[in-house]
UniProtKB/Swiss-Prot annotation:
Name of the protein in its database record: Serine/threonine-protein phosphatase 4 catalytic subunit
GO cellular component, one term: centrosome
Post-translational modification: Reversibly methyl esterified on Leu-307 by leucine carboxyl methyltransferase 1 (LCMT1) and protein phosphatase methylesterase 1 (PPME1). Carboxyl methylation influences the affinity of the catalytic subunit for the different regulatory subunits, thereby modulating the PP2A holoenzyme's substrate specificity, enzyme activity and cellular localization.
Residue numbers of Leucine methyl ester PTMs: 307
EC nos: 3.1.3.16
Pfam families linked to this entry: Metallophos
Family note: Belongs to the PPP phosphatase family. PP-4 (PP-X) subfamily.
Role played: Protein phosphatase that regulates many processes such as microtubule organization at centrosomes. The probable PP4 complex Pp4-19C-PPP4R2r-flfl (PPP4C-PPP4R2-PPP4R3) is required to prevent caspase-induced cell death (in vitro).
UniProt organism field: Drosophila melanogaster (Fruit fly)
Domain of life: Eukaryota
Cofactor note: Binds 2 manganese ions per subunit.
Catalytic reaction(s) noted: O-phospho-L-seryl-[protein] + H2O = L-seryl-[protein] + phosphate; O-phospho-L-threonyl-[protein] + H2O = L-threonyl-[protein] + phosphate
Residues annotated for Mn(2+) 1 binding in this entry: 54, 56, 82
Residue positions of the active site: 115 (proton donor)
Amino acid sequence: MSDYSDLDRQIEQLKRCEIIKENEVKALCAKAREILVEEGNVQRVDSPVTVCGDIHGQFYDLKELFKVGGDVPEKNYLFMGDFVDRGYYSVETFLLLLALKVRYPDRITLIRGNHESRQITQVYGFYDECLRKYGSTAVWRYCTEIFDYLSLSAIIDGKIFCVHGGLSPSIQYLDQIRSIDRKQEVPHDGPMCDLLWSDPEDQTGWGVSPRGAGYLFGSDVVSQFNRTNDIDMICRAHQLVMEGFKWHFNETVLTVWSAPNYCYRCGNVAAILELNEYLHRDFVIFEAAPQESRGIPSKKPQADYFL
């Protein structure tokens, strides 16, 4: 796009937590689709890069993240999904990230989380929020269509595998991820579902997930996968960590959580992972944006769903 003035104006508007017009959302999603369709299921990302976990519509905390981590395009970012649901500002959060993607496609990578799904967003807030803010379901439809185009995973310098949830018993090789047809709603089971839903667990082999989707996977599964694919570690999100990040299995799996004071009541801190060009790791810990800097909606937009 030769003229970025409209897009830059929309980005500024979204940064003030103001929604853009429905027809602007439609056009933005059309442009985003053109970019995302070219990305692979295992999207290649070059260091240096800052890796982020779940955001969940906590817009003012996303602003805090950029405050401590630096802005796009000065910094290169990878977000590991779950942009929407549960927080008060899923619309502004997702549209800001999407607008940044369209404006600076090589400086921000967005991969899909289990909440980037039609079914899940109808239960956990994004659908209702779109309806409330736009008076129709059109914006929800445009956004959920884009969800289908998001990459399923990313690999940094060929060495750090990034995925929202975890591993799948159906996948031994990265090439098996590359051959998935991702342009669909998240299935209830199978490899695509597992990548977005699974969790590491102190055990050997595979276990039944209490989430009802995906699997629990043990340290032996990880060492086999990492060895087979010649990678150093797996970086993922998907689980609340009170300290913002958590190592598993002798530093072969890392959970990063980037939504501070999750659901505005969990009291956790958040983290982002800064990787330099040598893949040296630096964790930046941050707290929720101060109360006075955030507009809290006058009434709660949704019921207290279980965490």
